[in-house]
């Protein structure tokens, strides 16, 4: 067998010749894994986007890729602002809520995420959260729960109850036991799980179905409960329609 120079972008061709009985091939793949994990520890995890797609037995209807370059186009901020963990968590949200299978609803959701967070500039509520202390409807039963569990992520998920539900869901569904979610609250989750903290809220509110059946305006209303910032949401929706393909 004659092999030519490996060209960037032809990783699939490279693995066509992979021989699991060849010790050099095995060592090379092990080295590749080490280098991938050095770049991004989550790249080889069970919930990484490419791993989930690889294991999926059905063909995806939409092939959205959440990359730093896409976020640069959507927000106008430089790509370096959006690290791999941020992009992975965004992809995780869209996959776990079913949005990744529907292009137009994905654009609707992204536009609202962008508006609610000022293009992902604010992933923690600016207010102190003191006003949420003692709010039983948020399950804030402990002193200091208000600031600890103030608005988190692009959708500003708020309250001990939501954080405990997210912790339980992540442990039971994904096998990820991360007690810091409840121990540290918003300051930790906004960095580690800015998007996935909203999975439960989106699913409980049937947001995908709302988008599919009733469209963009209904999506905005379900998220906002009104029409605050509607012109900006529309503007961001048009940006998403231009770049999310």
Give the role of each language-model region:
Residues 185-190:
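Exposed beta-sheet edge/beta-hairpin loop segments within beta-rich domains
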Residues 153-156, 197, 222:
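Generic structural signal for residues positioned in beta-strands
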Residues 135-151:
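Glycine-rich (often Gly-Gly/Gly-Pro-rich) flexible segments and glycine-rich loop motifs
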Residues 193-201:
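Internal mixed-charge
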Residues 1-136, 169-180, 203-245:
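Cell-wall glycan-active module
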Residues 147-176, 191:
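A structural motif
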Residues 67, 86, 149-150, 162, ...:
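Alpha-helical structural motif
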